[in-house]
Amino acid sequence: MTAKPEHYDVIRKPVITEKATMTSEANGVVFAVAMEATKPQIKEAVEAIFNVKVKAVNTVVTKGKTKKFKGRPGVRSDRKKAYVTLEEGNTIDVSTGL
């Protein structure tokens, strides 16, 4: 499957945290994705961009925090993460090039 331009709109960037690193040991990868992205779209985009087979996709929406800026309350943007589990034998190394 070849990657289309809309696939790059779905996947924003890889998430590199302690929890994401533990997920990679269980053959998984974590990506920040577009808020309107669905699980089938995320699966299709990962398979097309990285040439791997996806076993499952789980998503999490993190609500933006309320913070004060110059004494006035503001709200940070909501974020969506996708925990992508890969089939056995497939790997994605997101730490390359850091």
UniProtKB/Swiss-Prot annotation:
Natural source organism: Cereibacter sphaeroides (strain ATCC 17023 / DSM 158 / JCM 6121 / CCUG 31486 / LMG 2827 / NBRC 12203 / NCIMB 8253 / ATH 2.4.1.)
UniProt keyword Ribosomal protein present: yes
Q: Can you state the subunit structure given in the record? A: Part of the 50S ribosomal subunit. Contacts protein L29, and trigger factor when it is bound to the ribosome.
**Gene3D superfamilies xrefs:** 3.30.70.330
Position of the signal peptide: none
User: Which GO BP terms apply?
Assistant: translation
Keyword Ribonucleoprotein part of the UniProt annotation: yes
Per the UniProt record, one Pfam family is Ribosomal_L23
Q: What is this protein called?
A: Large ribosomal subunit protein uL23
Record keywords: Ribonucleoprotein, Ribosomal protein, RNA-binding, rRNA-binding
Q: Which InterPro entries match?
A: Nucleotide-bd_a/b_plait_sf, Ribosomal_uL23-like, Ribosomal_uL23/eL15/eS24_sf
Q: Belongs to which family?
A: Belongs to the universal ribosomal protein uL23 family.
Q: What GO cellular component term, any one, is given?
A: ribonucleoprotein complex
As for what it does, the entry says: One of the early assembly proteins it binds 23S rRNA. One of the proteins that surrounds the polypeptide exit tunnel on the outside of the ribosome. Forms the main docking site for trigger factor binding to the ribosome.
**Highest taxon of the source?**
Bacteria
| A molecular function (GO) term | structural constituent of ribosome
